[in-house]
Amino acid sequence: MAFPRVRLVVTADDFGYCPRRDEGIVEAFLAGTVTSVSLLVNGTAAESAAELARRHSIPTGLHANLSEGRPVGPARHNASSLLSPEGFFLGKMGFREALAAGDVALPQVREELEAQLSRFRELLGRSPTHVDGHQHVHVLPGVCQVFAEALQAYGVRFTRLPAERGVGSCAWLEAPARAFACTVERDARAAIGPFSRHGLRWTDAFVGLSTCGRHMSAHRVLGSLARALEDIPAGHALTAELMAHPGYPSVPPAGGCGEGPDAFSCSWERLHELHVLTAPTLRAWLAQNGVQLCAIDDLDSKRPGEGVPL
């Protein structure tokens, strides 16, 4: 398949979740496929992950978390709309349900985001290269506005826009996963306005919703890129991001963000992604199709190209 000129960022999410996860992420980075990582500052291994990032000079951003584990901000010590009675975030769907019901106080969201940005600076000694959202919370209605405000206040320019073209037609996705991916895509498109108004940048194309876990293969990554880049004029230079979740499976009770590792973290699917990313097939296919791997901080500080279809 013939691509236009493409620079691809491959981001490994959930850095800091547990040492075994981090071991796999670093392995994929050293293999040359993963080019960027997103750190969970409330992860149980956040401090050791930060040391790994420094040791290996890994471009590192913040994986803003409002849905799993314990907070790092004022909510730790006070009653908060973000937390369950047990003091944990409400979960991927629980947070969405509370937000839709109007039960989430957005000023508390802003406080937690700023606390995580500050914690990142404490751990790494610098600002994040980018900020995205754990379980895509950053593009949710209302949250996307305070998220954009917080990033602007902290001088962060790059984020992720998880709008993957054609994800609704990916028949290999189970119905619940496909429905969730379509909802994320819809929310991402609605977040473009707030993100743009606050000067945020993101890649021209995004893939990863359709290639998560067991669904990742070199063939599907290339196919997702092809869909994302359809109708791009010849000679147009493009940027794209592949979201990935590589790592060795967590072994309970180690890992997580304060309440232990989740099922996906403990499954073989993380290891499957690691194998796909470190095998020579994917890198060879990308190179054959003119795709150049790069880090997020290698990209031009400009908004996505005009005329690029979303």
UniProtKB/Swiss-Prot annotation:
Mg(2+) binds at residues 14, 134. Its cofactor is Mg(2+). The active site is at 13 (proton acceptor). One of its GO terms (molecular function) is magnesium ion binding. Its EC number is 3.5.1.-. SUPFAM superfamilies: Glycoside hydrolase/deacetylase. Keywords: Carbohydrate metabolism, Hydrolase, Magnesium, Metal-binding. It comes from the Eukaryota. CDD domains: YdjC_like_2. Disulfide bonds: none annotated. InterPro entries: Glyco_hydro/deAcase_b/a-brl, YdjC-like. Gene3D superfamilies: Glycoside hydrolase/deacetylase. One of its GO terms (biological process) is carbohydrate metabolic process. Belongs to the YdjC deacetylase family. Probably catalyzes the deacetylation of acetylated carbohydrates an important step in the degradation of oligosaccharides. This is Carbohydrate deacetylase. It comes from Mus musculus (Mouse). The lineage of its organism: Eukaryota, Metazoa, Chordata, Craniata, Vertebrata. The gene is Ydjc.
